[in-house]
């Protein structure tokens, strides 16, 4: 799609649209995605004719630095100014990132809600995106092996650090054991009650996620958690919970290969569990369902405060705009006002341009009073 100059002309409506750059974009990027997110934000910024300054997380700064070096090399190779893509100098600090957000024309923030709030308080126009914590339902009509394979592929991508990774699954009672068996065939490990408590006590320490265990590959995760020897050969780890807890419980975002499993008596309870999980973390972001019953999918969409409800998809890949769905490609998913965001969409190139509308007159098409008020008058009288 064209994003600079005249991008559309509609003579019948007397409307011509020009796309213009927003200016300098400040892109705050998370430690959990220190390479792909900077590239994604730089691509969208450049497509609108902007320059971008990337603020890395201190924990991911080395990876982001190398990523920016590679982008600058490609810009130079293609005859464009390298400084269209810049990086805050090391060592990066909160104060430096804050000053960048104060001075740019548009701040685009992926990361903690604290980062989003600081950007919004800077006085700069800000696009923030919501926290993930995706719960996914497996209902009684689902193709269990297909669902399990998709959940596995999505869960293990980047060791489950994606905001769109399945953090919990809710399985209907009448297919519960069959679904667990399918997940085991796909590569899952079913933790014992003792192992579940070991995972719980290791994953959260001091009231927060233990940074030493998140984003670890499966063999390392199994060893750190003290799981049975055979667990080291598995791909992800299922912990079964009887109810939804609060923050710093298995209902929260885990950024690891731990997958919480809930059992629901029926579909109504499954929907209630999903809403309870999102109330802990992730409201506005997304949920999903594996089903052959589209009425169930539509019910979930109607009754859940999220921007995205994916049907029969690997959540990590579909949420960001897969080749088999119509969502815009992105690595940053806004959550609407439910998540405190101004955007209710996937972050995409349209967010990085301003539009000028050239408006000329057209033949008047003025509605009559009857057209405007007729249905009201018919029902309630004049």
Whereabouts are the PLM-identified features?
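Rossmann-like NAD(P) dinucleotide-binding subdomain of oxidoreductase/dehydrogenase enzymes
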Residues: 4-146
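Hydrophobic alpha-helical scaffolding
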Residues: 90, 105-106, 137, 141, ...
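ALDH superfamily catalytic-core signature
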Residues: 39-40, 44-48, 66, 116-245
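Short, surface-exposed amphipathic charged segments that create phosphate/polyanion-binding patches used
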Residues: 100-103, 143, 203-211, 250, ...
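Conserved C-terminal structural/oligomerization subdomain of aldehyde/semialdehyde dehydrogenase
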Residues: 227-382
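Structural motif
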Residues: 23-27, 43-44, 50-53, 83-86, ...
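Electropositive phosphate-/nucleotide-binding environments in soluble metabolic enzymes
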Residues: 61, 65, 94, 113, ...
């Amino acid at each position: 799609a064209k994003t600079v100059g005249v991008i559309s002309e509609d003579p019948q409506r007397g409307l011509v649209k020009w796309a213009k750059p927003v200016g300098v974009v400040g892109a705050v990027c998370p430690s959990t995605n220190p390479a792909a997110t900077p590239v994604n934000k730089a691509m969208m910024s450049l497509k609108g004719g902007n320059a971008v300054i990337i603020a890395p997380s201190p924990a991911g700064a080395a990876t982001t630095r190398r990523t920016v070096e590679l982008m600058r090399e490609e810009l130079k190779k293609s005859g464009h100014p390298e400084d269209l893509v810049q990086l805050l100098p090391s060592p990066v600090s909160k104060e430096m990132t804050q000053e960048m957000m104060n001075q740019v024309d548009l701040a685009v923030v992926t990361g903690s809600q604290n980062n989003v709030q600081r950007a919004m308080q800077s006085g700069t126009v800000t696009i923030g995106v919501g926290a993930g914590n995706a719960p996914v339902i497996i209902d009684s009509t689902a193709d269990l092996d297909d669902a399990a394979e998709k959940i596995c592929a999505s869960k293990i991508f980047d060791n489950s650090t994606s905001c769109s990774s399945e953090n919990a699954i809710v399985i209907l009672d009448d297919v519960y054991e069959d679904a667990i068996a399918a997940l085991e065939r796909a590569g899952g490990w079913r933790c014992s009650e003792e192992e579940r408590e070991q995972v719980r006590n290791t994953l959260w320490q001091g009231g927060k996620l233990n940074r030493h265990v998140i984003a670890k590959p499966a063999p390392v995760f199994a060893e750190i958690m003290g799981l049975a020897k055979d667990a080291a050969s598995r791909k992800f780890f299922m912990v079964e919970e009887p109810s939804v807890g609060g923050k710093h419980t298995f209902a929260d975002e885990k950024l690891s290969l731990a997958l919480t499993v809930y059992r629901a008596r029926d579909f109504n309870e499954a929907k209630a569990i999903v809403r309870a999980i999102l109330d802990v973390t992730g409201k506005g972001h997304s949920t999903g369902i594996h089903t052959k019953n589209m009425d169930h999918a539509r019910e979930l969409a109607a009754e859940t405060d999220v921007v995205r409800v994916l049907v029969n998809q690997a959540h990590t890949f579909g949420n960001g705009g897969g080749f088999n769905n119509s969502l815009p490609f992105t690595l940053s998913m806004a959550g609407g006002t439910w998540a405190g965001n101004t955007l209710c969409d996937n972050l995409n190139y349209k967010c990085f341009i301003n539009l000028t509308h050239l408006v000329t007159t057209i033949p008047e098409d003025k509605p009559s009073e009857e057209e405007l008020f007729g249905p009201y008058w018919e029902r309630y009288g004049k």
